Regions:
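Conserved PLP-enzyme active-site core in the AAT-like
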Residues: 1-104
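Long, hydrophilic "mature protein body" segments
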Residues: 14, 241, 266-270
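Short amphipathic alpha-helical surface patches that mediate protein-protein
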Residues: 48, 64, 68, 86, ...
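Conserved C-terminal alpha-helix-loop-beta "cap" of PLP-dependent enzymes
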Residues: 93-262
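Charge-dense polyanion-binding interfaces
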Residues: 259-275
């Protein structure tokens, strides 16, 4: 109840469910749901071509136990999760300097609904990138959240959390603001840059390319992915034009501590571009 419509109810043919994040099963376990228009036997046949022949029965049993628990107690459990998440939102917003996004963002069009169990917090107003707050929470307060990016952190409230965990998170954020806040005017203003696609990703990926220092790639066409992980959303993809703003964004993300993935050069000092 009081949650966004799920993928299958919205008419999806197939949907993956990360049970290890929200349902209480062990890490690496998830479910693949199939709708009435999909032949699940055929899907299983195709999956068997690539998946291991030595399935982990520890993971499978944890999925089954979690499935049963959600069937028996799921509505009550997620009701508590929503209450804890809304409480966390109120407390974090009362600190000042942070903004925990909520249902007030819904506008009926570009933001159709909002999942309150995802506690996303804007951090730039205290002069810290989300990844910096993420690192502080992990290293100084022993709190592991989902991820941090240039301007936000994401904490995933699940059925395994308690109100004491929420209090620890809120207290840590208040402490971080008091001890580590900086002048926000030094922060990069851009959160996301929409690149221009000029070549299909497939053609760009397989085309002849060369590696250039990142500062020399402005105006060239990228032939590889560049992304911060987590969350793993590409900053650049094959076939997209590299601009100065994108270069500045990548360098800024590196300086703030984002884990960069995708390029052939793991340090992202060079980027592969089409010849």
């Amino acid at each position: 109840k009081n949650m966004p419509v799920n993928a299958m109810a919205a008419g999806a043919d197939m949907a993956s469910v990360s049970m290890h994040k929200s349902g209480g099963s062990l890490t690496q376990s998830s479910l693949l749901l199939t709708g009435p228009n999909v032949n699940w036997e055929y899907v299983s046949q195709i999956i068997n071509l690539t998946q291991t022949t030595s399935a982990s029965y520890l993971l499978l049993s944890s999925l089954d136990i979690s499935r049963r628990n959600l069937y028996m107690r799921g509505e009550a459990s997620f009701g508590k999760v929503q209450d804890m998440a809304e409480y966390a939102r109120e407390e974090i917003n009362s600190i000042g300097g942070f903004y925990a996004y909520g249902r007030e963002l819904k506008n009926g069009s570009s933001i159709y609904d909002f999942d309150v169990t995802k506690l996303s917090v804007y951090t730039r107003d205290i002069g810290l990138a989300g990844i910096e707050v993420y690192d502080l929470l992990r290293d100084e307060y022993d709190i592991q959240i989902e991820f941090g990016d240039i301007a936000n952190i994401l904490a995933y409230i699940s059925i395994g959390d308690r109100i004491q965990d929420i209090e620890r998170l809120v207290g840590a954020l208040a402490d971080i603001k008091r001890l580590y806040s900086k002048d926000p005017s030094q922060m990069l203003n851009t959160e996301y840059i929409a690149p221009k696609v000029v070549v299909s990703p497939q053609k760009a990926f397989y085309a002849k390319d060369e590696s250039l220092p990142i500062r020399e790639t402005a105006g060239r066409i990228c032939s590889e992915f560049v992304m911060c992980y987590p969350p793993g959303i590409p900053i650049l993809a094959p076939g997209e034009v590299i601009t100065k703003d994108i270069i500045d964004y990548i360098i800024y993300a590196k300086e703030k501590g984002c884990s960069m993935q995708g390029p052939e050069d793991p340090d992202v000092n060079n980027i592969n571009v089409l010849v």
